[in-house]
Every structure is written in structure tokens, then in C-alpha cells.
From Swiss-Prot:
Positions of the propeptide segment: 1-6, 23-24
Protein name (database record): Orcokinin peptides
Cysteine pairs bridged by disulfides in the record: none
Lyase among keywords: no
Intracellular or extracellular location(s): Secreted
Function: Myotropic peptides.
Family the entry assigns: Belongs to the orcokinin family.
The keyword Secreted is assigned to this record: yes
GO cellular component labels: extracellular region
GO biological process: neuropeptide signaling pathway
Species of provenance: Camponotus floridanus (Florida carpenter ant)
Tissue specificity statement from the Swiss-Prot or TrEMBL entry: Orcokinin-3 is expressed throughout the central nervous system (at protein level).
Length: 64
């Protein structure tokens, strides 16, 4: 049997390098946008909650 491992390596690499890279890039961008959107929402909610609590605290201190 005359098998040259170099040829099979080239075939395997050419098929599998393109397929996962394209799919992982698509998943990656979807994950990035999902993660960014959720982190932005958490940041806004956290910041707004903090400001609201701070305002309530300051108003309560002024009443005393």
C-alpha cells in the first residue's frame, strides 16, 4: 500500500480548518453581541439602582 501521510494531512486540514473557523466565528459574534447586550443592561440596571439608592439615602439623611 502506497500511502503518503502528507497528502492526507493536507486534505484533513483544508476541510476542517475552514469549517470550524467559519462556524466558530459565527458563534463568536453571536456570543459577543449577546454578552455585550446583557452586560450593558446589567451595567445600566446596576448604575440606576445605585443612583436611586444613593438619592434615597441622601434624602433620608436630610430628613433627620
Amino acid at each position: 500500500m502506497n500511502i503518503r501521510p502528507g497528502n492526507f494531512d493536507e486534505i484533513d486540514r483544508s476541510v476542517f480548518d475552514r469549517f470550524p473557523k467559519r462556524n466558530i466565528d459565527e458563534i463568536d459574534t453571536a456570543f459577543d453581541s449577546f454578552f455585550k447586550r446583557n452586560i450593558d443592561e446589567i451595567d445600566r440596571v446596576g448604575w440606576n439602582g445605585f443612583v436611586k439608592r444613593l438619592n434615597n439615602y441622601l434624602a433620608d439623611r436630610q430628613r433627620r
